[in-house]
Regions:
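Membrane-embedded alpha-helical bundles of multi-pass transporters/translocases
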Residues: 1-469
């Protein structure tokens, strides 16, 4: 297992997430959990949904094994890039011209005036999807060369752009802040592209793309493109479970009290921090390695990486899950309770965060096990598993929101995460999973979790008493 690469990727993601949390702290101070914060989060939700399931998720996991196996890498890469970019730009133009229908789709529970106020923000923010697709395409080429640092660090550029906008417009009215943030998103995405282009040139990968553009005999890669699409289309569903679930939750939250969309956003941001630093960083590094190993028939080597990564993620994610549940109030207080973000809003966000954290371990381990399905071209199986999880999550949301409000939506997502994990493990191999957990490490893990939970419980009592007096 490439621990150095995992550490580098994790550090880059950590830096990006820390700047993201700082951005969210400023955003909470400037907008609180208000009408305008809800409107910006709705507008920013759609490009982020497509980014995660379309650009970063399904595209990467279909493109990498196809690119590894391709005999005409430059031609294949440029053909896929141009097709996707033209498609995404067409959608962006359509949404720019007709933003209100798509905004209504995301916020069914809002009145016509609120939809009208949010629609221009939706039109601006959606162009970020085009920018981030270019970033994702370039990042996948860099992953092929085992370079992860640029991609991991580049998200900080988006955050820094938004932080600059918040500093400049902090004292302005909420409407001006929301518009400033929307334009800052596009500036940040452009900066991410620039950073990746510099690195692509450094690794001389630009020659592959230029060669592919000049050669352009697409008939040589027709079969490769068909194979890519056969992986990509199921991959959209396979990667979409948490994202579509969160998207549905956002829609359902518009039927709840004002601030519910913001509570979900702030809590999910904290939840995403350990998921990204630990699980996504590890899976990102392992994916090209596992793809190459399986492509070369080295199955045992691939599963050896799985064994090592499983215990690394289980210990780290388990500790983060307990910390997020037991220290939720101090965490939310430290990050968000200032300015227009009140103590009441803190307590509402705390419960949502705790419900999200219940799903941290299964979602993280699902990232690890599912990469074996994608690397071995079993995208349809992954899509079927994701569908089971999505149905469970959405149906649970419809029930739990009646009794628990926004926290019920978060809990439903966690339930879907456990379903995703169990079915993914079964598909990868129940016997292999049993062999992994039969290790003596299981006893150490149980002892560690119990001891750590007791320690955190008493730490939380002391910290809450200190901050609340």
């Amino acid at each position: 297992m490439k621990l150095r690469s995992i550490f580098t990727n994790s550090f880059g993601i950590l830096f990006s997430r820390v700047t993201g949390l700082f951005r969210d702290v400023l955003m909470a101070s400037a907008l609180g959990a208000s009408v305008w914060s809800d409107m910006f989060f709705i507008a920013f939700k759609l490009p982020n949904l497509f980014r995660r399931i379309f650009a970063e998720g399904a595209f990467t996991q279909a493109f990498m094994p196809s690119f590894v196996a391709s005999r005409h890498k430059g031609v294949f890469a440029t053909a896929i890039f141009l097709r996707f970019l033209l498609f995404l730009m067409s959608i962006s133009v359509l949404i720019t011209l007709f933003p209100e229908p798509i905004t209504k789709l995301m916020a069914w529970g809002w009145d016509a005036q609120k939809i009208a106020d949010t629609a221009p923000l939706t039109a601006i923010n959606f162009w970020y999807l085009d920018l981030i697709f270019i970033v994702t395409f370039l990042a996948t080429l860099l992953q092929y060369r085992d370079h992860f640092a640029t991609t991991a660090m580049s998200t900080a550029l988006l955050n820094l752009s938004m932080i600059s906008a918040l500093y400049l417009y902090m004292k302005e009215d909420p409407r001006s802040v929301a518009y400033a943030l929307s334009f800052a998103v596009l500036i940040g995405g452009s900066m991410q592209i620039a950073a990746h282009l510099v690195t692509i040139r450094y690794f001389r990968l630009d020659k592959i793309l230029i060669g592919g553009w000049k050669y352009r005999k697409r008939k040589d890669v027709e079969e490769e493109k068909k194979h890519f699409h056969s992986l990509f289309l199921p991959g959209i569903l396979g990667n979409s479970t948490p994202q579509i679930s969160a998207f549905v939750d956002t829609i359902l939250a518009t039927f709840l009290m004002t601030g519910s969309v913001s509570y979900l956003f702030y809590a999910n941001r904290v939840f995403q921090l350990p998921l990204a630093i630990i699980a996504i960083a590890t899976a990102t590094v392992l994916f090209p390695t596992v793809s190459k190993a399986l492509n070369n028939g080295e199955e045992e080597r691939a599963y050896q990486h799985l064994n090592q990564a499983f215990w690394l993620l289980t210990f780290l994610l388990g500790a983060a899950m307990l910390g997020g549940i037991l220290l939720a109030e101090p965490i939310v207080w430290l990050l968000f309770e200032r300015g227009k973000f009140t103590q009441v809003q803190t307590l509402d966000t705390v419960v949502v965060l705790q419900m999200y954290m219940i799903g941290l371990l299964p979602f993280g381990l699902s990232k690890l096990f599912s990469l074996f399905l994608y690397a071995s071209h079993r995208h349809k199986k992954a899509a079927k598993i994701a569908l089971y999880s999505l149905i469970t999550s959405v149906s649970s949301s419809l029930v739990l929101m009646q009794f628990m409000g926004a926290s019920g939506l978060a809990l439903a997502g966690s339930i879907g995460g456990w379903v995703l994990f169990l079915f993914t493990v079964r598909e990868v191999g129940t016997e292999r999973f049993r062999d992994i957990i039969k290790s003596r490490r299981s006893l150490y893990y149980i002892g560690f979790m119990v001891s750590f939970a007791i320690l955190l419980h008493f730490a939380n009592i002391w910290i809450v008493h200190y901050i609340r007096g």
